[in-house]
Amino acid sequence: MLFRCNILALVGGGRNPRYPPNKVMVWDDHQNRCIGELSFRSEVKAVRMSRERVVVVLEYKIYVYNFADLNLLHTIETASNPRGLCSLCPDSRACVLACPGLQKGHVKVELFDITRTTIVPAHESSLGHLSTNLDGTRLATASERGTLVRVWDTKSGQRLHELR
């Protein structure tokens, strides 16, 4: 659901799915109709939305679309991402996307507002979770082991804190 509005992203799944698991339906609940469709060759693992972007996560790729017209803006290659890990900053002034990098335990931080990419060598083992703060300046990561949470600066990639 996009903030507190009537726009939803739906992906098929479960026992009797209405839609296939490789399709994203952008649904306007106020109009009670589909306002956009995105189809892929593989299963959709996650969808993130902001006022400007729709981000679709597949196991090895992430697609970033313009929200207004669903035009493709970026394609990002990732390492295997079966959990659909991805964080999109909701602040419209800072378009920040964090996702798994190409190497195990690394995070790729895309700073779209200043067209810069930062690679963060977050953990030695595979990522278990990642999340940005509301204004996109910080990134928190945990590995699959779950023994450490690390906090990073998104612009510099510098580690700020480590919590056990």
Segments predicted by a language model, with ranges:
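Beta-propeller domains
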Residues: 1, 7, 11-30
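Residue-level detector of Asp-centered blade-edge/turn motifs that repeat once per structural unit
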Residues: 2-4, 49-51, 91-93, 134-135
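Short, solvent-exposed loop/turn segments at conserved positions within beta-propeller repeat blades
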Residues: 16-21, 56, 100-105, 144-145
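Per-blade loop-tip surfaces of WD-repeat and WD-like beta-propellers in eukaryotic adaptors/scaffolds
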Residues: 25-33, 64-79, 102-127, 144-161
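Acidic, low-complexity cytosolic segments
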Residues: 29, 36-38, 43-44
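Canonical WD40 repeat/beta-propeller blade segments in eukaryotic WD-repeat proteins
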Residues: 42-48, 80-91, 125-132
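Hydrophobic alpha-helical hairpins/lids featuring a short glycine-rich hinge
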Residues: 46-70
